[in-house]
Amino acid sequence: MPEVERKSKITASRKLMLKSLMLAKAKECWEQEHEEREAEKVRYLSERIPTLQTRGLSLSALQDLCRELHAKVEVVDEERYDIEAKCLHNTREIKDLKLKVLDLRGKFKRPPLRRVRVSADAMLRALLGSKHKVSMDLRANLKSVKKEDTEKERPVEVGDWRKNVEAMSGMEGRKKMFDAAKSPTSQ
């Protein structure tokens, strides 16, 4: 059954109008939020920083006021430094935790693995631990074959190699090779 393209229920002009209305509303909200932040900033500064009355103060009173203000500035500067250090520490910790989460999820790129030849004994040691002394001799189960018997069964033909080359050349030689390959399997 061929799939029928679904027509949008909203026309393109209507979509565009809705999009522009949404952007206008978002802009209004952003401007309002910005104004609220500025008002909050002014209110906070007016609470924390009292207006200075420097008129009518003597030189010694002005110097005392300056020393007092410098001390307050130093305290605020130390607090700012401490907050920056805490923020930096928290940022590093967040970064480390994000890496741990990625490791746990398995979302990191795995390096290409190389094949490593491991003997059966080494594999068992790795699986069971170093406490267990397990020896797995796989060759013990194999049937032993004596080399001398196999060599005696086949008689070694020693002949002139030139005659063999001449005999095997041409179509007759190929036929002999074909027949020779056929004969051992039929026995």
Curated annotation (Swiss-Prot):
GO terms for cellular component: troponin complex. SUPFAM superfamilies: Troponin coil-coiled subunits. The modification N-acetylproline is found at residue 2. It comes from the Eukaryota. Residues 97-118 are annotated as: Involved in binding TNC and actin. Pfam families: Troponin. One of its GO terms (molecular function) is actin binding. Keywords: Acetylation, Actin-binding, Muscle protein, Phosphoprotein. GO terms for biological process: transition between fast and slow fiber; ventricular cardiac muscle tissue morphogenesis. InterPro entries: Troponin (IPR001978), Troponin_I (IPR050875), Troponin_sf (IPR038077). Residues 2-48 are annotated as: Involved in binding TNC. Troponin I is the inhibitory subunit of troponin, the thin filament regulatory complex which confers calcium-sensitivity to striated muscle actomyosin ATPase activity. Belongs to the troponin I family. Binds to actin and tropomyosin. This is Troponin I, slow skeletal muscle.
